[in-house]
């Protein structure tokens, strides 16, 4: 009986880990990423002179812009 319970516990842990999704900060709160989105980003962009805009959240690729941060662990883009 103990062996059966231990086996069930191990299978449950393995199955739960397969459904892991990344969590990233947004401007207001947290965002659960889609399975294909493997990175969190934080970047500052200039839409017009003297008006910076901060963008945060999940992304498929790391941005290559000068003022950007890209990471791949939960809540790493604060």
From Swiss-Prot:
Endpoints of the signal sequence: 1-21
- Read off the Pfam families from this record: Toxin_cobra-type
Q: Where is this site: Key residue for inhibition of muscle alpha-1-beta-1-delta-epsilon (CHRNA1-CHRNB1-CHRND-CHRNE) and important for inhibition of neuronal alpha-3-beta-2/CHRNA3-CHRNB2 nAChR?
A: 46
Which GO cellular component does the record give, naming just one?
extracellular region
The UniProt site entry described as Key residue for inhibition of muscle alpha-1-beta-1-delta-epsilon (CHRNA1-CHRNB1-CHRND-CHRNE) nAChR is assigned to 44
- Pinpoint the site Important residue for inhibition of muscle alpha-1-beta-1-delta-epsilon (CHRNA1-CHRNB1-CHRND-CHRNE) and neuronal alpha-3-beta-2/CHRNA3-CHRNB2 nAChR: 28, 43, 51, 66
Instruction: Specify the domain of life of the species encoding this protein.
Output: Eukaryota
Disulfide pairs?
Answer: 24-40, 33-58, 62-70, 71-76
What is the purpose of this protein? This three-finger toxin binds and inhibits the nicotinic acetylcholine receptor (nAChR).
Which tissue types show expression of this protein? Expressed by the venom gland.
Which UniProt key words apply to this protein? Acetylcholine receptor inhibiting toxin, Disulfide bond, Ion channel impairing toxin, Neurotoxin, Postsynaptic neurotoxin, Secreted, Signal, Toxin
Q: Where is this site: Important residue for interaction with muscle alpha-1-beta-1-delta-epsilon (CHRNA1-CHRNB1-CHRND-CHRNE) and neuronal alpha-3-beta-2/CHRNA3-CHRNB2 nAChR?
A: 67
Q: Where located? A: Secreted
**Annotated site (Important residue for inhibition of muscle alpha-1-beta-1-delta-epsilon (CHRNA1-CHRNB1-CHRND-CHRNE) nAChR):** 45, 47
**Family in the record:** Belongs to the three-finger toxin family. Short-chain subfamily.
Q: What is its main location?
A: secreted
Q: Name one GO molecular function term.
A: acetylcholine receptor inhibitor activity
Q: What is this protein called?
A: Short neurotoxin SNTX6
User: Which Gene3D superfamilies does the record cross-reference, listed alphabetically?
Assistant: CD59
């Amino acid at each position: 009986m103990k062996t059966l319970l231990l086996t069930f516990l191990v299978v449950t842990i393995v199955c739960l880990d397969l459904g892991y999704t990344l969590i990233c900060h947004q401007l207001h709160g947290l965002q659960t990423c889609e399975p294909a989105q493997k990175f969190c980003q934080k970047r500052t962009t200039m839409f017009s002179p003297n008006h910076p805009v901060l963008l945060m959240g999940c992304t498929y690729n790391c941005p290559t812009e000068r003022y950007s941060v890209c990471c791949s662990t939960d809540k790493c883009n604060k």
